[in-house]
């Protein structure tokens, strides 16, 4: 699974707990978008999570 190139957000692992308290493994995956960004004056493609896109931690290349 892809990881955010800006904040290094990655997959989290945990347990799904039913009403009868049975536990099974589950994962939480980040919302990753592959977009073009401007870095050091040049454009490149990067894997960026939507949290970083919303908070303007990266400038998009149009």
Curated annotation (Swiss-Prot):
InterPro entries: Bacterial_rp_bL28, Ribosomal_bL28, Ribosomal_bL28/bL31-like_sf, Ribosomal_bL28_bact-type, Ribosomal_bL28_sf. Pfam families: Ribosomal_L28 (PF00830). Keywords: Ribonucleoprotein, Ribosomal protein. GO terms for molecular function: structural constituent of ribosome. The keyword Ribosomal protein applies. GO terms for biological process: translation. GO terms for cellular component: ribonucleoprotein complex; ribosome. The keyword Glycosyltransferase does not apply. NCBIfam families: L28. Belongs to the bacterial ribosomal protein bL28 family. PANTHER family: 50S RIBOSOMAL PROTEIN L28, LARGE RIBOSOMAL SUBUNIT PROTEIN BL28A. This is Large ribosomal subunit protein bL28. The gene is rpmB.
């Amino acid at each position: 699974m892809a990881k955010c190139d800006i904040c290094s957000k990655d997959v989290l692992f945990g347990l799904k707990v039913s009403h009868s308290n049975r536990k099974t493994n589950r994962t939480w995956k980040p919302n990753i978008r592959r977009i073009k960004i401007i870095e050091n004056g040049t454009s490149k493609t990067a894997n960026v999570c939507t949290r970083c896109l919303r908070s303007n931690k990266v400038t998009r290349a149009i």
